[in-house]
Amino acid sequence: MSSTQAPVEPPKRRRIGVLTSGGDAPGMNGAVRAVVRMAIYSDCEAYAVFEGYEGLVHGGHMIRQLHWEDVRGWLSKGGTLIGSARSMAFRERAGRLKAAKNMVLRGIDALVVCGGDGSLTGADVFRSEWPGLLEELVKNGELTEEQIEPYKVLNIVGLVGSIDNDMSGTDATIGCYSSLTRICDAVDDVFDTAFSHQRGFVIEVMGRHCGWLALMSAISTGADWLFIPEMPPRDGWEDDMCSIITKNRKERGKRRTIVIVAEGAQDRSLNKISSSTVKDILTQRLGLDTRVTVLGHTQRGGPACAYDRWLSTLQGVEAVRAVLDMKPDSPSPVITIRENKIMRTPLVDAVQETKHVAKLIHDKDFEAAMRLRDAEFKEYHFAYRNTATPDHPKMILPQDKRMRIAIIHVGAPAGGMNQATRAAVGYCLTRGHTPLAIHNGFPGLCRHHDDQPVGSVREVKWLESDAWVNEGGSDIGTNRSLPSEDFETTAMCFEKYKFDALFVVGGFEAFTAVSQLRQARDKYPAFKIPMVVLPATISNNVPGTEYSLGSDTCLNTLIDFCDAIRQSASSSRRRVFVIETQGGKSGYIATTAGLAVGATAVYIPEEGIDIKMLSNDIDFLRENFARDKGANRAGKLILRNECASSTYTTQVIADIFKEEAKGRFESRSAVPGHFQQGGKPSPMDRIRALRMAVKCMLHLENYAGKSRDEIAADPMSAAVIGIKGSQVLFSAMGGEDGLEATETDWARRRPKTEFWLELQNYVNVLSGRASAGKPLWSCYESKHFPSCCRLYNTDLSIDIDPSALTSS
């Protein structure tokens, strides 16, 4: 089709355009890939608009059709491969007139725009003007009535791609967690030199007029002080900052000082607070050897983290579904996320609310600005302020409300355990509680509680826990042993050390431990105290939550491993790697990692493995490699959960593939093993650890002063904190409707309903495997869980033309 002459007849398939605009953000390529492949899967054609709105204005070769194989390998690439630009021409009506003409000439009547609030505002203006633009094009003689007839309605769907995370109505924007990862990596590296020389560092981070990056990096790195636009410091902040830093260094022995400054930081009179100003105050007033580090555009670069790959993929798929669902009078949606739930929000409302926040800040109504950011933002700010330093005299509780709170880790190590403990300790000290760490789990409690000179039950000091801010694993020690191994001694220790509450951090073993303690209350009154479980396991298999601490760290570690393996596979061209993942009898890690790395197939325990499945996948791989014809990035990855099959092990599958390939491709196996538990926790695990640990402490505080029988009678006195859909909730473990009875598959050590199962559909669809004889969801457990997913309410059974799918 000519770029200057539109056909009279509309194209046989609907054409969906996709563009990236404004500042680039990691994850944009994942969104484009998902839009392109979901469009093709849905029997549509996908067109990329290169260089953002500038490409729409210029048309011609800047609007090109993308095929299935064109977006192969894009998930691991940073930035945006279709380019981005801040178009001045598109801001003018004359530019939008050219853009409308170019879209009609290409037969495109739907546009998915990935960008910030400015880009999405431009998209909505474009849609509102669309009928008038077409009329003007006909009036000017540039197009005919016959040409514009099929394109009277323009559908716009927004994806928020921005490292700033400044869009209202969503918890996260595409790219924000990758940017946060860059910041945390940089500050973690600064720790060493700051500690060595007892220096102070003032770190300036991006974010424009939004303080999300600054706040989350302050939480993730344990910064001593923070400046964000939404909550400027009160007058006299210079004295407050110097007082806190002096106490942290001289009274508590902290050797390093970190201050995080958002680039839009200001005081309550809207005067800018620069990083150099803060540095001068620390140097002149405290005599502190201070350095300024401006991270700049390194925060935008590099590959997307696991969360941004996952988010961009699911939102890209949802954007295509939204296009196909839209009616002529439907408002333009923007695809958002609340906790773990993908949602559609009216684009106009989200943009207006975002602009309203900026106006409130300008009008000095900072409390209202904080409320409008989102519920999470204000909670995180509260949690940060109450854990960064224990100096909050107004927060101290009266003596009769103070508690002795025991903290224990149970299960395998997971990223975020230390950060949850640090947050709990910080909050306890702020409120006047006594935090007591039980070292080395229940065996440590029973066997070594009275060891000399140091027992396993020890009060935690602020400086000790502050050092855990970026440490992986478990500094107080963890294991899988349960209290049922010695109830007598466990109860005796509870009495001896006068535990008023128990905070348990861990995986399915932690859940089981609290269940056992709850059920033993009648025999052992010492267990009639409030107990709460904060799920922390890479397997993400704890009932009562859709997210466990450590799972994000594991995913990031695993995708780094897979990216390196894919490079090897692609360099050898015709090679398949079968990679074994951990996760026990839950396929969460394998499935979400498969989605994040673009795996060809994922084998999980919920589905099992049989010879027919392997035969279909061998045929699929053989056809894929035959079509590649020397194409680049031709390596394939298959992920297999360690418990997917006792017969078809990782090595056996690799050997079967190699044998059946008959020389057409090679196969290798790779087992990352305990490497998947990760090193330093990811920023997401760090910040969620803080928020959820503080919530747990608030929950335990509700029982202060109550009798043992009152506590035991309350089902919520033994609870699990978790993310369910778009909410953070506490769920009771006992009772007829409790987690133990209704949501726990004890035999398989996982929840009865696993929210992520529908992700397997997306892995198959986006790899092309769904057209290769493999049913979208053939798991035997689907009989038991026909509607297991509140998050991805998706029907993917669309009639497609198999020839539209080429290689994965």
From Swiss-Prot:
Residues 1-389 are annotated as: N-terminal catalytic PFK domain 1. It catalyses: beta-D-fructose 6-phosphate + ATP = beta-D-fructose 1,6-bisphosphate + ADP + H(+). Pfam families: PFK (PF00365). Pathway: Carbohydrate degradation; glycolysis; D-glyceraldehyde 3-phosphate and glycerone phosphate from D-glucose: step 3/4. Residues 390-403 are annotated as: Interdomain linker. GO terms for biological process: canonical glycolysis; fructose 1,6-bisphosphate metabolic process; fructose 6-phosphate metabolic process. ATP binds at residues 23, 86-87, 116-119. The active site is at 164 (proton acceptor). Allosterically activated by ADP, AMP, or fructose 2,6-bisphosphate, and allosterically inhibited by ATP or citrate. Mg(2+) binds at residue 117. It is found in: Cytoplasm. Its EC number is 2.7.1.11. Beta-D-fructose 2,6-bisphosphate binds at residues 480, 537-541, 575, 582-584, 642, 668, 674-677, 749. Its cofactor is Mg(2+). SUPFAM superfamilies: Phosphofructokinase. Homotetramer. This is ATP-dependent 6-phosphofructokinase. It comes from Aspergillus fumigatus (strain ATCC MYA-4609 / CBS 101355 / FGSC A1100 / Af293).
